[in-house]
Amino acid sequence: MPDLLWDDVKSLFDPDANGTLPDVVVEGTTEDWQVLLDLVQSQGWQYAYSLSGEPELPSAADMVAAASADATPELRVWPVPDVLVIFRVYQAESIDFDVDLRELQGQERLDVLVYVLRSIGKRLGKSVLMTPEGSPDHPALGFDVEADRAVLMVDPIDPGVFSDE
């Protein structure tokens, strides 16, 4: 049985209510960017790195150095065709990425998201949290490293669950 069922979480995947590009983050990752790059390559996921334009992935140190020089390196990854994950290097201390809710409709696509979150979380040994676009203090779901599974962190039926009130 899947970690998350579409019928239980589909309200969280409404782009009109929660923004098109929810934020996903792994905190405390100073040494983990290279592990992420190695994961992308070992999984055989398609990717494109947009800062240097070179077909090979740079080292994590090069990506973090570019971010420190007021650039925002962007790594676009397709774990499956038609599902894009966009990693942006803002700082070494966290791995930040976006997914497009329009691409994640239905159980099959939810399972792809859970697979990506689980793959990253297990490889890094850290939890991976997804929040509505622009609401970093309101995690909706994620991979819980201690539970070793994807978990729902809010009541998806409560329409005020993401408000700051």
Please give the residue ranges for each predicted region.
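Acidic, proline/glycine-rich low-complexity IDRs
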Residues: 1, 102-165
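Sequence termini and other peripheral, non-core segments
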Residues: 1-7
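Short, flexible, solvent-exposed loop/turn segments with mixed acidic/basic and small polar residues
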Residues: 7-18, 85-91
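Terminal, regulation- and interaction-focused segments at domain boundaries
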Residues: 12-32
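Glycine-rich, often proline-containing surface loops adjacent to acidic residues and nearby aromatics
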Residues: 16-23, 90-101
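Ordered hydrophobic segments in well-structured contexts
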Residues: 23-25, 48, 74-76, 86, ...
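Short, well-structured hydrophobic secondary-structure segments
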Residues: 25-80
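Aromatic/basic-lined ligand-recognition segments
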Residues: 66-91, 146-165
